[in-house]
């Protein structure tokens, strides 16, 4: 079972940069997408359907902003849109597909980098999302929570930890939340198989950061502990360049 998560930073722009050809070549069973920046009616999905994918979409109310999707070659038993909290669901941040024996979520966590108001919103989200997952995990114990978390967990996950110590995405309280999230029954699938430094999933467009690999690892596929023994492989694909993020891959034994 191959699951990929990818913040495409605008699905329409990504398609013009060869996204569909890449998808055909990579051929995941399930693709979780974040930051669609489009309504489903605005995107020609005919080539996606032709590749054998069913498409599930949750866009934000605000045009050209946020939004998550799941493209799946396996028909889910159920698809759940949102997390049931209006202020987050209006921003298109959570989508879940339930399959036989496991569930996959595509999640786009808020960024706080634009200022204090959005940072406060992000901190509210983190607490509320944790409570939501605590309850969800009782009903759906086999969870893959894939997406853009907008947080680097540890110093190894960011190119300049000292210089970014006061930056949103690497604040002590955000990292503490991530530590708590993992301690409540989740495994960072990439770190389960790779403990090396200099593996990142997002790079600023400024100052040639990507070419110099001055990045942040803010995209994760978190796997609930009952599924952890099924992790076969996990990787990051920095050579794939339709976005300021790159895709992250998880292979699970069926």
Can you describe what each PLM-predicted range is?
Residues 1-9, 101-113, 146:
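Active-site-proximal beta-strand elements of phosphoester/diester hydrolases
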Residues 7, 23-41, 104, 133-155, ...:
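Active-site beta-strand/loop signature of hydrolases that rely on acidic residues for catalysis
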Residues 51-54, 127-214, 218:
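Metal-dependent phosphoesterases centered on the DNase I-like endonuclease/exonuclease/phosphatase
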Residues 84-85, 110-126, 162-166:
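Surface-exposed cleft-lining segments at the edges of enzyme active sites
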Residues 37-39, 44-112:
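Structured beta-strand-rich core segments of catalytic domains in phosphoester-bond hydrolases
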Residues 73, 97-100, 224-225, 250-254:
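Active-site beta-strand termini and strand-to-loop segments that position acidic
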Residues 63-78, 197, 209-229:
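Conserved beta strand-loop-helix elements of the APE1-like EEP
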Residues 1-50, 54, 60-66:
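N-terminal, active-site-proximal structural segment of metallo-dependent hydrolase catalytic domains
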